[in-house]
Amino acid sequence: MSAIVDIIAREIIDSRGNPTVEVDVLLESGVIGRAAVPSGASTGTKEAVELRDGDAARYLGKGVLQAVENVNTEITEAIIGLDVEEQSFIDQTLIDLDGTENKSRLGANAILAVSMACARAAAEESGLPLYRYLGGSGFMQLPTPMMNIINGGAHAENSVDMQEFMIIPAGLPTFREALRAGAEVFHALKKILHSEGLATTVGDEGGFAPDLPSNEAAIQYILQAITAAGYEPGRDILLGLDCASSEFYKDGLYHLESEGLQLTSAQFADYLATWVDKYPIVSIEDGMSEHDWDGWKLLTDRIGKKVQLVGDDLFVTNAKILREGIQKGVGNSVLIKVNQIGTLTETFTTIETAKRAGYTAVISHRSGETEDTTIADISVATNALQIKTGSLSRSERIAKYNQLLRIEEELGDATSYAGKEAFYNLK
């Protein structure tokens, strides 16, 4: 048994300059596990609750001292002495201690930081890399990355309605080569935007945030950059979108302000289907609002056999909501964000629920990130085959990519790169 002897929480700063929670879990052996939690900008209404202090005199009300206090007192008392290797028991203890459906009493940020730090301590104690500790000794594949190189919506101050335009280097032979392709396209795009007098400042996730005449213009610039970097769109590099449609869904209509359009669910499904026919788009996240299940069903029936339709705000990493979506034939993929649900055990349950139903699972960062690389290990440990962790700039994004490079190197011939196999449920 590897007993927990102390837990120390602190308030640190995330990539947006906002406070977040970091936790150290100390074991009897002297081993320490450390983890820090992320925070989102566009959030689903059913996400687990991130506890903020609301004190306007500190960090504009975004302090997390109460969450830190909850860890250092109540949570510590509840799990000191427990075996750190009993992850599911620890997580259930935290859930029961909180006692609410959405972790609003103690805070999902407090609970998740402890859950992740316990896993890190247990891995260290076992002498295993985190991905091996979490995933066992079986065959593991490196995930195909979805790289957000043009930011819009809630992630940027610009005229683009949709939140993310991504490149997916699925046609490359290794993760290392996929990462290189992504970086080369990123630099080619910067050069193109600069030559046209467009801004090359970056958004929260490290992608460029230029003012463009339309949402479609973002796709066209990216295709130009792929070609300029010496790659072939559709063969080497595919495209992905995160519409974050809940952000512009009002009164039953989709308001694309940059184009002066107000579309019904059926019209917006047509709009997206036209793009899918025209461009090598393989993945669309939150193509409809979380409040528009009928629209989701319409979109799934329309293009769900040839495009990955990822539920983020829709499913909020919640196995119960995902099961409802599976039953109703809504979407064919789930985005996995550890802080939407609040423990590692519940995160893994959602991933398994997706896989059993033939849905894909995409491991994801948040727009407010830290240097914590746990999600990189989770993507390999669970054989999720896809990861979404930002652009090719900003260290909090690159930290995850660099961890995946290390994992690929460690596994050597005992691994392969998922590539286009990541989209196993498409025809």
Curated annotation (Swiss-Prot):
Listed GO MF terms: magnesium ion binding; phosphopyruvate hydratase activity
Cofactor note: Binds a second Mg(2+) ion via substrate during catalysis.
Primary location recorded for the protein, binned into one broad class: cytoplasm
Reactions catalysed according to its record: (2R)-2-phosphoglycerate = phosphoenolpyruvate + H2O
InterPro entries: Enolase (IPR000941), Enolase-like_C_sf (IPR036849), Enolase-like_N (IPR029017), Enolase_C (IPR020810), Enolase_CS (IPR020809), Enolase_N (IPR020811)
Binding site for Mg(2+): 242, 285, 312
PANTHER family: ENOLASE
Family, per entry: Belongs to the enolase family.
UniProt protein name: Enolase
Gene: eno
